Amino acid sequence: MATEINIGENIKKQRARIGLSQEDFAKKSGVKYTTLTKIESNVIRKPSVMIMSKIAKAFGVSIEDLLK
């Protein structure tokens, strides 16, 4: 059975690691605050590639790194 990747949890951990609030990270990444909160709380389980690209760029990592 394949392990399900929790993208929202990965993003939340990365954001907390760099010490940014959801609001501050939303501004930094260019992703709407409401979208970010929905991703982190798994309301949005599969964000678009464009959203993932913005988030990855703000962290300075690849999209693939967010999926690990």
Q: Which residue ranges define each predicted feature?
A:
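A short, Lys/Arg-rich alpha-helix, primarily the initiator
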Residues: M1-R17
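Short alpha-helical DNA-recognition segment
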Residues: L20-K38
